[in-house]
Structure formats: C-alpha cells, structure tokens
Amino acid sequence: MLQPKKTKFRRSQKGRMKGNAQRGNRLSFGSFGIKTLQAKWITGQQIEAARIAVTRCMQRQGQVWVRIFPDKPITKKPAEVRMGKGKGSPEGFVVPVTPGRILFEVEGVVFDVAKEALRLAAQKLPVTTKFIVRHDYDFNILK
C-alpha cells in the first residue's frame, strides 16, 4: 500500500479542491498517459490496482510512471459512535486530484497496447479520465 514513511502531522483538514491542476498537467516522461477530468480523492489501493492492471496488460514491456502519491492522511471514527469527542483515528492516505492532473504515463509500447492498458487502469480509478498522447509522437514508430 502506498503511504508516506513519515508525516509531520497525524491528521489533516479536509480542504477544498477547486480549479484545474496547475502542476503535473503535462506529459513529462512517457508518450502516452491518462489525465483526470474530475476532482476527487484517490486512495493508495486504487493507485496500486491501476498500476498492476497496466503492467499486466503491457506484459511487463515498456515502462510505467505513476505521477501521483497519496500523502494526505484520512481519519475515520468507529461504527456506531456519537458525534463529537474529537477527530477520528487515521484510516489511510489519499491524493486529492483536480481536473487536468496526469495520473499515469507509459512508454515503450505501441499505441494500441498503451491505449488498452490505460483504459484498464482508468476502470480501477474513481475519476473519469482521458487518454492523451505526446504532441510530437510519431505513429509510424514501433509498428
């Protein structure tokens, strides 16, 4: 499970996600990627499930970059507990993503394989995504 080794504070405020992604919104490593079209929290388990789906579909060829990391602690109160009496105990970690944020990047496979692999990854995630291709990608390569 993805989580930070050490955090400065055990609990954090919920915060608000407004606007589009200002950072992490361009392909930096691979030729293909998926970017979000919604604002949502993504957990470490969801990221790991999507990563496994991509690597299995690509049959361990090429390279995959995960561009997000869950570093926001989430708390939860036990079942059937009355309101109040303080904030709940830490439950796990999430990453808040806003529209335009690149989640995964892929390199070293043909277009069709990359598109299918990232489609499978998108099904594991709670956000709607869009498949994107690097602007200078040559479609005649690797055929």
UniProtKB/Swiss-Prot annotation:
The keyword Cytoplasm does not apply. GO terms for cellular component: cytosolic large ribosomal subunit. Pfam families: Ribosomal_L16. Residues 1-25 are annotated as: Disordered. Keywords: Ribonucleoprotein, Ribosomal protein, RNA-binding, rRNA-binding, tRNA-binding. Residues 1-17 have a biased composition (Basic residues). One of its GO terms (molecular function) is rRNA binding. One of its GO terms (biological process) is translation. PANTHER family: 50S/60S RIBOSOMAL PROTEIN L16, LARGE RIBOSOMAL SUBUNIT PROTEIN UL16M. Part of the 50S ribosomal subunit. Belongs to the universal ribosomal protein uL16 family. Binds 23S rRNA and is also seen to make contacts with the A and possibly P site tRNAs. This is Large ribosomal subunit protein uL16. It comes from Azobacteroides pseudotrichonymphae genomovar. CFP2.
